[in-house]
């Protein structure tokens, strides 16, 4: 037997030789929080992370940072939307997330550490048998969320008294490149926007650097916005 073939067979038997790590599904908490707080979901034993969205001029438009326990619960989550001058910082305390500055109870939890209610806004979340948030109900709206078999978010539909807004995402066929996706936004039956993202990935199949193009089709002619996303991820 030739030596290269022997080495190949040994690699297959031992499942080593620098093969990528086996894929892990997205946890219910990671998938659901990414849906609700608008960031890219991550796989594997994430300890802490940051995602920074930058405009084509190199200016920071949005940043999300979080720390997680070994059980996959978000211990802290901080969001800064510089384009809209909004922000949020949450810290886990038993069955609630508190405001990190005022310590006011903001988000009520269910199960291990899943979203249950946002009392100040009158919003409640419902989960499926696997623990994924599948709907959010408020005073004047309802949101329904969709996932694939790995827990990857496939979009959502928001229904209120005026219209129905739907976002439908289609990830790459390559299971290791889930964050390479296209998405279409519609108001009722009218397409109003589309998004395309492509990324480079680490050994856990998590995105490291991404390029994001958002096209606003609600105006004529349509306007494209180009962004880059820088991810820093530490693992247990």
From Swiss-Prot:
Q: Where is the lipid attached (S-diacylglycerol cysteine)?
A: 17
Q: Which PROSITE patterns match?
A: PROKAR_LIPOPROTEIN (PS51257)
Q: How does it sit in the membrane?
A: Lipid-anchor
Major location (coarse): membrane
- Locations listed in the record: Cell membrane
Q: What domain of life does the native source organism fall in?
A: Bacteria
Q: Which UniProt keywords apply?
A: Cell membrane, Lipoprotein, Membrane, Palmitate, Signal
Q: Which InterPro entries match?
A: UPF0257
Which GO cellular component terms are attached?
plasma membrane
Signal peptide region: 1-16
Lipid addition sites, N-palmitoyl cysteine: 17
Q: Which HAMAP family match?
A: UPF0257 (MF_01065)
Q: Which family does it belong to?
A: Belongs to the UPF0257 family.
NCBIfam families reported for this sequence? PRK02939.1
Q: What is this protein called?
A: UPF0257 lipoprotein YnfC
Lineage of origin = Bacteria, Pseudomonadati, Pseudomonadota, Gammaproteobacteria, Enterobacterales
What is the gene name?
ynfC
């Amino acid at each position: 037997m030739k030596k290269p073939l022997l080495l190949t067979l040994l690699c297959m038997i031992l499942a080593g030789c620098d093969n990528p790590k086996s894929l892990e599904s997205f946890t219910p908490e990671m998938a659901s929080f990414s849906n609700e707080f608008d960031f890219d979901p991550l796989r594997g034993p994430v300890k802490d992370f940051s995602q920074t969205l930058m405009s084509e001029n190199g200016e920071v438009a949005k940043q999300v940072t979080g720390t997680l326990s070994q059980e996959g619960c978000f211990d802290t989550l901080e969001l800064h939307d510089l384009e809209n001058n909004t922000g949020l910082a949450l810290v886990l305390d038993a069955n609630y997330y508190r405001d990190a500055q005022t310590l006011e109870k903001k988000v009520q939890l269910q199960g291990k550490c899943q979203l249950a209610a946002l009392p100040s806004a009158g919003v409640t979340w419902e989960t499926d048998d696997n623990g994924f948030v599948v709907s959010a109900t408020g005073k004047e709206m309802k949101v329904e969320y969709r996932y694939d078999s790995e827990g990857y978010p496939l979009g959502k539909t928001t229904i209120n008294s005026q219209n129905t807004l739907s976002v439908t995402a289609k990830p790459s066929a390559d299971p290791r490149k889930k964050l390479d996706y296209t998405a279409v936004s519609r108001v009722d039956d009218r397409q109003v926007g589309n998004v395309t993202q492509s990324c480079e990935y680490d050994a856990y199949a998590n995105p490291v650097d991404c390029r994001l193009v958002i096209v606003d089709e609600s105006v004529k002619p349509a306007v494209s916005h180009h962004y880059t996303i820088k991810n820093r991820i530490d693992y247990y």
